[in-house]
C-alpha cells in the first residue's frame, strides 16, 4: 500500500513540476486502484480483530496498521489534489516559488515514517515528528512568497497583472502548499502510531 501511494505521490509531484497534464490525468485515474487496495487491507484488519482477538503488542500492531492505512489513503487523495491543480493552475506566473523543496521533505518524512513502521525504529519515529517544524516553516515561507509576488507584480504591472486575473492561480498555489504540508502531517501520524505500537507510548499521538 505504501509503495502504491508513494508512486502516486511521486507522479503527482513530477507532473506539477513539469506541468505534465497527461501524467496528472494518470494520477487521477489511478486513484481507484489505491481505494481498492485500501478496502482490501481494511477488511484484513477487521478480520484479524474479529477472528484472532489480538492482545497487548499484537493488538497495538493491528490497531496501528489500521490507522496507518487511513493516513496512506489520505495521502493518495492529496496526490490526486496535486494532479488536479496541475490541470487548473498557471504555474508560470509563480515560477519562483520553490515547491520541490517542500515536496521532497514531505516525501522523506513519509518514507522514514514507513521505514520506522517496518523496522520498529522508535528513534526514527521521533526524528520524523521533529522535522514537522521544518516543513511548516518551508510552507509558511512559500505562502508568504506567493502573496508578496502578487502584491509586487500588481504594483509593477498595473492592469496587466490585475488581481482578479490571477486570484484563482494564487488560491490554487496556496492549496498546493497546504496539501504538501498535510502529507507531512500524515507522515507524523504514521510515526506517532508506530511509536505507540512499539513502546505503548502516546507521546506523539
Segments the model singles out, each with a brief description of its role:
Residues 1-205:
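Cytosolic, long alpha-helical scaffolding segments
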Amino acid at each position: 500500500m505504501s509503495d502504491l501511494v508513494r508512486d502516486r505521490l511521486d507522479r503527482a509531484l513530477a507532473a506539477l513540476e513539469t506541468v505534465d497534464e497527461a501524467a496528472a490525468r494518470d494520477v487521477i485515474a489511478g486513484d481507484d486502484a489505491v481505494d481498492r487496495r485500501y478496502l482490501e487491507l481494511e477488511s484484513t484488519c477487521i478480520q484479524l480483530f474479529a477472528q484472532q482477538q489480538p492482545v497487548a503488542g499484537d493488538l497495538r500492531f493491528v490497531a496501528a496498521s489500521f490507522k496507518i492505512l487511513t493516513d496512506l489513503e489520505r495521502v493518495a487523495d492529496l496526490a490526486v489534489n496535486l494532479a488536479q491543480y496541475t490541470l487548473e493552475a498557471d504555474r508560470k506566473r509563480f515560477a519562483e516559488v520553490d515547491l520541490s523543496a517542500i515536496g521532497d521533505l514531505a516525501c522523506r518524512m513519509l518514507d522514514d515514517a514507513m521505514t520506522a513502521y517496518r523496522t520498529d525504529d522508535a528513534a526514527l519515529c521521533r526524528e520524523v515528528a521533529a522535522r514537522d517544524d521544518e516543513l511548516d516553516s518551508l510552507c509558511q515561507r512559500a505562502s508568504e512568497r506567493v502573496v508578496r509576488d502578487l502584491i509586487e507584480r500588481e504594483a509593477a504591472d498595473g492592469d496587466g497583472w490585475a488581481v482578479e486575473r490571477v486570484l484563482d492561480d494564487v488560491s490554487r498555489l496556496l492549496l498546493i502548499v497546504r496539501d504538501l504540508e498535510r502529507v507531512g502531517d500524515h507522515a507524523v501520524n504514521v510515526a506517532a502510531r508506530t511509536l505507540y505500537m512499539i513502546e505503548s507510548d502516546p507521546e506523539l499521538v
